[in-house]
Structure formats: C-alpha cells, structure tokens
C-alpha cells in the first residue's frame, strides 16, 4: 500500500504551524545561521530551480537542529525593483499591492514544500518598518563621507527611464543593454548619489582570505576590485596636467603618444578647434559601445588625433594626444601613456595610424610588440636594469623630481546608488533653496512613498516622484525644502537583510539596530554560517553586502566585519531538453504541478538526489518517479510493522556505517551520496525479517529521512508510536566499534603465487586456516595429484602451500 502524499502533507504542515515547531530557539551555546538568497517575489512564482537551493538549506537546517544547535533559518522578500514597477505601468496597479499579492503566492508555495522557516522572522525590504533602517544606514554613510552627490558618467537606459549600475548591464552584439529587458544603454552625465565603496577596497580584498567561499567567486571579486600597484605620471599639455596611471613606469622612455578615453573630461579642453567636430562625432559613436567590445583586442583599432600635444616628462619629447575607445575612463585616470613596442593594443594602434615605436626592453624580434622580460635599452639611467630593478629606480626618480607619485589603483568603481524610478526606498534627504543637503531627522524616518498615479518614468533624468509636488515640497517651521526625488536601488535593501532577520521579533517588526538587545543578538548569530545562492551575484549583492557589513562593523554595531562565513553556489536545474528553463522554450517545470502529482517529499528528495549540489543537470520525470517509488517502499517497510526491542546485531555494521557516512556527507553538502546511503540501509533492512529488526535502528533511519522528506518522516515517526515531532529529536549516533569489521582477508598461495583469498574472523588459528585452504576450490585445482605438500600458515595474513 502506498502513502497519500496530499493527506500527509496537509496534516503535518498544519501540525508544524500550530505547534510553532520551527521557531528560532536561544537555549544552546551552539548556533547555526543558515540562509537562502532571498527571492524577488515575481508574478511567476517559484520554479523548480528555486526549490533546489531552498531544499538544500532546509536539509542543512534540520540537520543542525537535530544536532542540538540553535538554528536561525529565515525567509523574506527582496521586494523593491523594476519588474513590479514595469508590471504596474502596464496594468495601472500600484506596485506595492502587486508585490504583496506575489508575496502571498510565494509564501504559500514555500509552505507547501515543508520548508522549516521561522515565519516570525519574515521581512520585506519594501515595508516602511524595514526601509526605515535602510534610510538610517544611508544617513550614517553620508555622515562618514561615504555617500556623495556627484555629476558623473552613468549608464542611462531611456526605455527604463533610469540609470543602471555596471552589474545591471550586459553586452549584446557589441552594445550595452540592460540585464532586465535588454534595452539599449548609453553613457550620459548626470547628478547622482554614489557610495564610496572604493574606500573599502583594501578591506574587501583582505577579508576574502579567511572566507570559506568557492575560489571562483573570490577570484571574481578580486578581479572586480582589481588592485594594481603602480605610479601616476604627470604629462603636461601647455598648462593642463594629464595624470597617467601605469603599472609599468619603467617603460616611460618608450611612451610615444598619449591616449585618452573618449569620456575623459580633459578631451574637450585639449581638443583644438579644427578637430572639435571629428572628436565629438567619435565620442557619440563610442557612447553606445559595451566595455566588452571596447576591450576586445581582435577588433580593429579606431581613434582620433585631437590636435594637441603633451610633453613626455622623461624624454622631454613632444608627443601626440589621441582619443580611442580601447581606453576606458573608469580605470586609472582615463588616460594611458602608449608604449607600442611593449603593449599589443598600443602596437596595433600605432601601426594603423603610423605613430612612432621605440623599443626600451631588449628583444631579438622587433617585428611585433615584445611583452616579455629583458634588460632595458634606450632608457638612459635604466639601461641594463631588469624590470624589478628599473621599477624601483623610476618610481624613486619620479617622486624625487615631482613628476608624479607612487599609487595604488583599483578597477572597482564607486557604487552608483540612485535610480530615477518610483518604486524604491526614498532618500532621507532634503534640499534648501540654495541646494544644500539636509538630512531628515531620525524621528521623522521612515520617509515613505506617496500614494500617487505618477509612477511613469519621465525619461528626462528626473524621477516620477518629481511630479508629486505635495510630497516633494516640505515646510519645516518657516523654511521650505524639497525632497530628493531619486530612489535607492534594489541592492540597498538586500545589503543588510541578513541582519534584519536577527532584529525581527515578528513579521516586519524590527528592534533598534543600536540597542543593547540588538548587540546581544548580533553577537550570537553573526556571521551567517552557511549561505546558498547563485554565483551570478558575485560582484553585485555579495560585494555590496560585504561593504555594508564592514561599514557597520566600523561603527561598532556588528561583532564581525564579514557577513557570510561559508558560501555555496548551487547548480541550475535545466529543462528536460537540457536547456535553461524559459517560457520561450516551453520547458519550465512548475513545482505546484509536481507537488500535486508526486508530492513535496518526492520533489525534495529528487532534487537532492539528482547529482552534486553544485552541478547543473536536466530535469527528468523518470528520476522523479523513481524518488516517489522509493518513498513508497520506505512507507511499506514501516507501516503496520511491529519492530523488535531486542537487538539481534545483524544490522549493527550497516546501520552504524550509514549513520557515520550520512553525518559526514550532510556536513559536506553531499546530499546525493547521503541519500544513496539511506537506500543502502533500506535494502539491508528488507533482507531481514522485518519484525526482527531492532526498532531504534528504524527510528534512526526515519530521523535521517526527515531531512529530505519531512512530511513522510513525521508520519512514520508517529506510526512508530512517538507523539512528538521527529524534527525536534536528537540526530542518531553511531558506535565506532560496530563499524570496525572483525574479519580479515587471508591470501592463499601455491608456491608463493596468489591463487585465492578467504575472509575469516581475526585470530583464526593456523590449523583452521590450513583446513579452509584445503577446502578452497581454486587451491584444490592447483594441488590435485600432488602428495608432498608443505603448509606454512601465518595467523591473520597468509597460507602458503609448497609443492615439494
């Protein structure tokens, strides 16, 4: 007889809720903070890809709870963002109402899956009680000089009516487009809020060393931060200084021209009148190109001579100044000294435009750029020195002669922190009549979004909030002010949500971050012990949240500077056709349908059994069927069976061996092999007369099963005569002495050659060993017909038969 998954799931979900089984406890010294990357509550709801990561954290949370840990396993909603606003624009609905409806749908799906979330810890980044703290943190960043309002080059998306951060842009056909919707993106100068994450570049780099993260993610962050030690050299053009950052100041004698990024603010100042039209056209052409295309070395180099010259401070030569899209404005100073003899891109550019090439490092082949090591030539006082020696000498010379300075440079740019959209956190900022910035008082937080129909982007660079005059205009006493009308990006709320869970007393009810109670809780729970989510957040959310955590740590509010000690990236679940699930492919699997036909337990078990957690694998309905079939086998094994209270010891070895292996495998997140071990145990149990099987071994199996298929495990636990939740039981222990086999393999030889082996109990005497050898079929074949036989036996090792 098979079990009814619908009846069992409904029964136990009701039990868990009524008995508050998953409430966060605070009774043990040991803690486990296990966290999912919280979802954006889209209209589409959960898909089976979400289920994979959420099931993994649920398995681990249940495991640590049974091991006696206080477990914090919360869930919440990354609720602000473009999709809700885009939907609201199409339908005329308020994005807040749309988001709340989606959250209810998402939550219902999570409950159906039997996840062990503490819903008293539920948070919503778009709830005013939540973003009150987001606004307060922004104020602290501003007070410390880490938030600035600047006129800067930004990524402008006309279709979305807002600026986008670098991590929100992708490349398509050589052009920049928005990650959401793939709309065109261009460079544009605008006044924007930025957070000076660059001030924390060194801390963010060093902090990676002690994190248990995938090396690939750490390398992505290191490369994104991009620390370079070098020198900034001043090239003069009349009375204008052109600072150039280089890691190879030793090649300055080979610098034969200067190249500026087209966006560099010096370009128009340096361009001669006869070149102005040509330069402006080139700047406009470059604005649409993606960084990937501009850095592509295989592309034919383009550029324009701007009509001006600079002086090489070492050679005193007059060299041309060009602009080209292969130089990026957001690295260094947006200018390079071109050394075509020793840089491939400079070589390609110089050969195309017939510019001078001077070798300053010795090479036998001067037909192409030489980028290897060698002695310096044509370099005055650097001649005959190698790279390391010459760098030290030239850096000292440049600083001593006031030609520049040693400098550390980062590829990391400051975080663009404002958006020209309605649906985001309002800034706690006012402007007086002289445009001075005034921070809103703490007592007046949160600044909430108004109820309005003006949510359509203006496409002029202003937020829709600028149209809501009764919200924008504020009178305090007899003074009039205007509110900041830009809103914060979606990444604001997600940069500290892991802290908010700790502060939550009940749904969206947070205690004061600066309170003594907050300090006590934060000291207990931080950092997050296990964080599971996708690698695509490596240089966005994972970097921003580290920055905010470091900042709050420096304020003395947090006990640790790093938010996530252990990070794991789960693989994707692909469609049955081995392609990424997509509505356009028609290969999306809806978990609601699977729960209806197979049940949540089978779905959970299948996704954890598919393969390694970090592997991306195709969906298989055959695999799902097999998971349900095995769960039914488990049910039949226990249903209506009276097990023995006396241990006949037949299953001692396999049970204790499985418990040990499963414990280790769960710790290492090797869930598929842990399930394989449970199958080994079930097979062994079925080989016995079920009524003779030791009941504590059956109970231990049910405890282990509960990690993966909690509804069925609760039902089986009850059928075994227990009246409390299996979730709250202690994790099964194993007896190491029962795992050590009391047998040994004996080698059977004839004239010193191995002919067979036998397995016997340790300590078996010589006479018995010889007798067993004489009865062995393989040995009989080799000694048959021989009479003069000599037997040499060594206990626990060998029997050698010598034919004389």
UniProtKB/Swiss-Prot annotation:
Record localization: Cytoplasm
Keywords: Aminoacyl-tRNA synthetase, ATP-binding, Cytoplasm, Ligase, Nucleotide-binding, Protein biosynthesis
GO MF assignments: aminoacyl-tRNA deacylase activity; ATP binding; leucine-tRNA ligase activity
Domain of life: Bacteria
Listed GO biological process terms: leucyl-tRNA aminoacylation
Record-listed ATP binding positions: 583
EC code: 6.1.1.4
The family this protein is said to belong to: Belongs to the class-I aminoacyl-tRNA synthetase family.
Gene Ontology CC entries for this record: cytosol
The UniProt record lists the keyword Metal-binding: no
Statement: the UniProt record of this protein carries the keyword Lipid biosynthesis: no
Short sequence motif 'KMSKS' region: positions: 580-584
Chemical reaction(s) catalysed: tRNA(Leu) + L-leucine + ATP = L-leucyl-tRNA(Leu) + AMP + diphosphate
Species this chain originates from: Mycoplasma capricolum subsp. capricolum (strain California kid / ATCC 27343 / NCTC 10154)
Protein name as catalogued: Leucine--tRNA ligase
PROSITE patterns, per database record: AA_TRNA_LIGASE_I
Residue stretches in coiled coil: none
Sequence motif 'HIGH' region, location on chain: 39-50
Pfam families: Anticodon_1, tRNA-synt_1, tRNA-synt_1_2, tRNA-synt_1g
CDD domains hit by this protein: Anticodon_Ia_Leu_BEm, LeuRS_core
């Amino acid at each position: 007889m098979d079990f009814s998954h619908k009846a069992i799931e409904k029964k136990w979900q009701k039990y868990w809720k009524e008995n508050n089984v998953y409430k966060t406890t605070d009774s043990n010294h040991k803690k486990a903070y296990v966290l999912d990357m919280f979802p954006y509550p889209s209209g589409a709801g959960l898909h089976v890809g979400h289920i994979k990561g959420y099931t993994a954290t649920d398995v681990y949370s249940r495991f640590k709870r049974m091991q006696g840990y206080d477990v914090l396993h919360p869930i919440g909603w990354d609720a602000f963002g473009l999709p809700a606003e885009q939907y609201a624009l199409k339908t005329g609905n308020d994005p807040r109402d749309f988001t709340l409806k989606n959250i209810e749908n998402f939550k219902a799906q999570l409950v159906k899956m039997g996840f062990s979330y503490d819903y008293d810890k539920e948070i919503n980044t778009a709830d005013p009680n939540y973003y009150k703290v987001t606004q307060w943190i922004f104020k602290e960043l501003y007070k410390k000089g880490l938030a600035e309002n600047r006129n800067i080059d930004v990524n402008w998306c006309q279709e979305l009516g807002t600026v986008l951060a670098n991590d929100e842009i992708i490349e398509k056909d050589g052009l920049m487009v928005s990650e959401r919707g793939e709309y065109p993106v261009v460079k544009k100068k605008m006044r924007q809020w930025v957070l000076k994450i660059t001030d924390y570049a060194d801390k963010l780099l060093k902090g990676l060393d002690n994190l248990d993260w995938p090396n690939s993610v750490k390398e992505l962050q290191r490369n994104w931060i991009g620390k370079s030690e070098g020198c900034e050299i001043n090239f003069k053009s009349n009375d204008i200084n052109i600072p150039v950052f280089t890691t190879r100041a030793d090649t300055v004698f080979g610098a034969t021209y200067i190249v500026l990024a087209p966006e560099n603010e010096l370009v128009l100042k340096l361009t001669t009148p006869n070149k102005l039209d040509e330069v402006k056209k080139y700047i406009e052409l470059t604005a649409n190109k993606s960084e990937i295309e501009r850095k592509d070395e295989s592309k034919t180099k383009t550029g324009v001579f701007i009509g001006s010259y600079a002086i090489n401070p070492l050679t005193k030569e007059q060299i041309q100044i060009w602009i080209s899209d292969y130089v990026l404005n957001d690295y260094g100073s947006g200018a390079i000294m071109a050394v075509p003899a020793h840089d491939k891109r400079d070589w390609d550019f110089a050969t195309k435009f017939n510019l001078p090439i001077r070798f300053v490092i010795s090479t036998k082949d001067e037909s192409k750029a030489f980028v290897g090591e060698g002695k310096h030539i044509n370099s005055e006082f650097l001649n005959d020195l190698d790279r390391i020696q010459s760098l030290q000498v030239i850096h000292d010379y440049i600083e001593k002669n006031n030609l520049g300075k040693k400098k550390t440079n980062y590829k990391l740019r400051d975080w663009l922190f404002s958006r020209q959209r309605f649906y985001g956190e309002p800034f706690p900022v006012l402007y007086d009549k002289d445009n001075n910035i005034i921070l809103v008082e703490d007592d007046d937080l949160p600044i909430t979004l108004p109820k309005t129909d003006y949510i359509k982007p203006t496409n002029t660079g202003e937020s829709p909030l600028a149209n809501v005059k009764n919200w924008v205009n504020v009178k305090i006493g007899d003074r009039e002010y205007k509110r900041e009308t830009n809103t914060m990006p979606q990444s604001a709320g997600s940069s500290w949500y892991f802290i908010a869970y700790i502060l939550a007393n009940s749904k969206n009810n947070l205690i004061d971050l600066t309170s003594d109670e907050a300090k006590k809780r934060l000291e207990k729970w931080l950092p997050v012990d296990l964080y599971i989510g996708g690698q695509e957040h490596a240089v966005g959310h994972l970097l921003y949240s580290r920055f905010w955590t470091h900042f709050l740590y420096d304020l003395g509010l947090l006990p640790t500077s790093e938010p996530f000690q252990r990070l794991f990236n789960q693989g994707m679940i692909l469609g049955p056709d081995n392609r990424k699930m997509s509505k356009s492919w028609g290969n999306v699997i809806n978990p609601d349908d699977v729960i209806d036909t197979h049940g949540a337990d089978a779905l959970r078990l299948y996704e954890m059994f598919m393969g390694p957690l970090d592997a991306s694998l195709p969906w298989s309905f055959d695999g799902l069927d097999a998971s349900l079939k095995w769960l039914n086998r488990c049910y039949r094994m226990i249903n209506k069976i009276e097990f023995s209270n006396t241990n006949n010891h037949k299953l001692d070895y396999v049970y204790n061996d499985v418990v040990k292996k499963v414990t280790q495998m769960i710790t290492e997140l090797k869930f598929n092999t842990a399930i394989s071990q449970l199958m080994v145990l079930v097979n062994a149990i079925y080989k016995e007369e079920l009524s003779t099987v030791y009941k504590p071994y059956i109970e231990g199996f049910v405890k282990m099963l509960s990690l993966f298929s909690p509804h069925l495990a609760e039902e089986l636990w009850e059928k075994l005569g227990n009246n409390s939740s299996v979730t709250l039981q202690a994790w099964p222990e194993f007896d190491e002495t029962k795992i050590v086999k009391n047998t040994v393999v004996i080698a059977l030889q004839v004239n010193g050659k191995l002919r067979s082996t036998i397995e016997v109990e340790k300590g078996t005497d010589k006479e018995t060993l010889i007798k067993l050898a004489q009865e062995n079929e393989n040995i009989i074949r080799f000694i048959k017909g021989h009479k003069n036989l000599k037997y040499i036996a060594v206990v626990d090792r060998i029997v050698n038969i010598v034919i004389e």
